[in-house]
A protein has these predicted regions:
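Flexible, glycine-rich terminal cap/loop adjacent to redox cofactors
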Residues: 27, 118-125, 134-220
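A short alpha-helix-loop-beta-strand transition element characteristic
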Residues: 42-46, 102-112, 138-142
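A short alpha-helix capping/helix-coil boundary motif
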Residues: 10-12, 16-19, 106-110, 167-169
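Active-site-proximal substrate-binding core of FAD-dependent oxidoreductases
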Residues: 79-83, 98-125, 205-211
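FAD-site-proximal beta/loop scaffold in flavoenzymes
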Residues: 3-11, 16-97, 189, 193, ...
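A broad, structural micro-motif
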Residues: 18, 125-127
C-alpha cells in the first residue's frame, strides 16, 4: 500500500506505517492444478501435483513437470513446491526421456536460484532457516563478508555469504550470497557441495580456480 504511485509508505496489518523509497512485491506463486484435479490426478500435501521419480502422475499415461509439481527437497527430504525455471527445464527433459522409453529419474530439488536487483546479485541454494526449523533439523550459521577477488587487486567488491550447516556432522545445508560480483560463482560451488553432501571442512579443502582478478587464494 502506498500514499501515491511511488509507494512512499508501507502500511502493515497493525496499522503501523513504514516510510519507503522503494517497495518490492515478492508474493510467490500458487500452483494452478484445476486441470489435474478434474483429471482425477493425486494432489500432494503442498497443493502440487504428485509425481514419482520419473515424473509420472497417479495416471500412468500422464507425466507432469514445472511449477505445479510437488517435489522432494534435497536437504530436508520433505515434499515442497519450488517453482523455478531451472528445475522445470530439467524436469521437462527428464519427462521427455521417460516418455520416449529411456528411464531417467528426478530425485530432488535443491532450490538453487539467482536474481539481479539493480547492481546487486542475490543467490541461494539448499534450505533456509525457516525450512530447517519446520523439518526439525538442527543447524548453525556462519556469516562472512569477503571481497569478490584479491583485495589488493583493483576493483575488489564486498560479498556477503551465509552458510547453514549441521552442527554435529558439519554437512552443508544451505547458503545465500549477495554482492555486485562473485555471488553467482560462490553459490554454484556451494550448490554442488550441498548436492554432493560435503561437510564444511571438505568445502574448505576444495581446490578452485585462482588468480587475483577472479578470487582469493583463501576463497570464502
Amino acid at each position: 500500500a502506498g500514499e501515491d504511485a511511488l509507494a512512499s509508505v508501507v502500511v502493515l496489518k497493525d496499522g503501523s506505517r513504514i516510510p519507503a523509497d522503494l517497495v518490492v512485491l515478492a508474493m510467490g506463486v500458487r500452483p494452478e492444478t484445476s486441470l489435474a484435479r478434474e483429471a482425477g490426478l493425486d494432489i500432494g500435501s503442498t497443493g502440487g501435483i504428485k509425481v514419482d521419480e520419473h515424473l509420472r502422475t497417479s495416471d500412468p499415461s500422464i507425466w507432469a513437470v514445472g511449477d505445479a509439481v510437488e517435489v522432494i527437497h534435497g536437504v530436508t527430504g520433505q515434499p515442497c513446491l519450488l517453482p523455478m525455471a531451472g528445475p522445470a527445464n530439467r524436469q521437462g527433459r527428464i519427462a521427455a526421456e521417460n516418455v520416449l522409453g529411456r528411464p531417467t529419474t528426478y530425485k530432488a530439488s535443491f532450490g538453487t536460484g539467482i536474481l539481479r536487483i539493480f547492481r546487486l546479485t542475490a543467490a541461494g541454494t539448499g534450505a533456509n532457516e525457516r525450512m530447517l526449523r519446520q523439518a526439525g533439523m538442527p543447524f548453525a550459521a556462519v556469516h562472512v563478508h569477503p571481497m569478490d577477488h584479491a583485495s589488493y587487486y583493483a576493483g575488489a567488491m564486498p560479498i556477503s555469504i551465509k552458510l547453514l550447516f549441521d552442527p554435529t556432522t558439519g554437512r552443508a545445508l544451505g547458503a545465500q550470497a549477495i554482492g555486485q560480483r562473485g555471488a553467482d560463482k560462490r553459490i554454484d560451488v556451494l550448490a554442488t557441495a550441498i548436492q554432493a553432501g560435503l561437510t564444511v571442512r571438505q568445502i574448505a579443502q576444495l581446490e578452485l580456480g585462482y588468480a587475483p582478478p577472479y578470487g582469493s587464494a583463501k576463497d570464502p
